[in-house]
C-alpha cells in the first residue's frame, strides 16, 4: 500500500496476532512468470509470460488471480533469461536435486524484473500458474505428454522438445462480483467471439 496509515495499522495488527512481523523490500519493476518443468536430471524452461491481475481496465480495481496473460513476455529478454537461469533456476535445481526426495514437476517462478534487467523472486509455486499456463502451453511445438512423462520418469534431460516462435494471449471472463463475492451458476455470455 502507499497509504502510511494503512501500513501502520497492518503492522500493529500483525504484532498483536503473534508478535512477529516480516518486512520486505518493495520491489519496483515489471513482473514475469516462468514455468520450469524439472526433475533430478535437468529442467526445461518454458517461454516466460506476463499476467495482469487487476480486475478493471487501466490497471484499476482489486487484485485477482489474473484477468489475462500473454507470452512471450517482452520484458524477459535473452539477457534477463540468462540471469534468471544462472542466479535463480540453476541454484534452485541444484538445491532440489540434493534433497532426500528429488523434485519432479513444475516450478512456477514469479519474478520482478527491475529497470536494470535484474530478476528478483517474488514467489515460487510447485504447480502450473493460471492464467499463465493458458498462454505458455500452446507455444510448446513438441508433444507435451512426452515432456511430462519424461519428467515423471526422471529423464527430462533426454527429452527432445521445441518451442514455437508464435505469441499467445488469453482473456479471462469472470462472473459478477469476482474476486470477492462471485456469483456462481450463471452463464457467461459473449464467448462466441472468433479471431
Where are these regions (language model features)?
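Internal nucleotide-binding/catalytic subdomain
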Residues: 1-134
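Active-site "cap" helix and flanking loop/linker of ATP-utilizing ligase/carboxylase catalytic domains
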Residues: 85-107, 125-195
Amino acid at each position: 500500500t502507499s497509504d502510511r496509515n494503512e501500513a501502520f495499522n497492518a503492522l500493529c495488527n500483525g504484532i498483536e496476532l503473534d508478535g512477529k512481523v516480516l518486512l520486505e523490500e518493495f520491489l519496483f519493476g515489471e513482473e514475469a512468470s516462468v514455468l520450469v518443468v524439472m526433475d533430478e536430471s535437468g529442467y526445461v524452461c518454458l517461454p516466460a509470460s506476463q499476467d495482469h491481475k487487476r480486475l478493471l481496465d487501466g490497471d484499476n480495481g482489486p487484485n485477482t488471480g489474473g484477468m489475462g496473460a500473454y507470452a512471450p513476455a517482452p520484458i524477459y529478454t535473452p539477457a534477463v533469461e540468462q540471469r534468471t537461469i544462472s542466479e535463480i533456476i540453476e541454484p534452485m535445481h541444484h538445491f532440489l536435486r540434493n534433497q532426500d526426495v528429488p523434485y519432479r514437476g513444475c516450478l512456477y517462478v514469479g519474478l520482478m524484473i527491475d529497470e536494470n534487467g535484474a530478476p528478483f523472486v517474488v514467489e515460487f509455486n510447485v504447480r502450473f500458474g493460471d492464467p499463465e499456463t493458458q498462454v505458455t502451453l500452446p507455444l510448446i511445438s513438441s508433444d507435451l505428454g512426452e515432456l511430462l512423462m519424461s519428467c515423471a520418469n526422471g529423464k527430462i534431460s533426454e527429452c527432445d522438445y521445441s518451442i514455437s516462435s508464435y505469441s499467445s494471449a488469453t482473456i479471462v471472463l469472470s462472473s459478477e462480483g469476482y474476486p470477492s463475492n462471485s456469483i456462481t451458476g450463471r452463464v457467461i455470455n459473449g464467448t462466441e467471439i472468433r479471431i
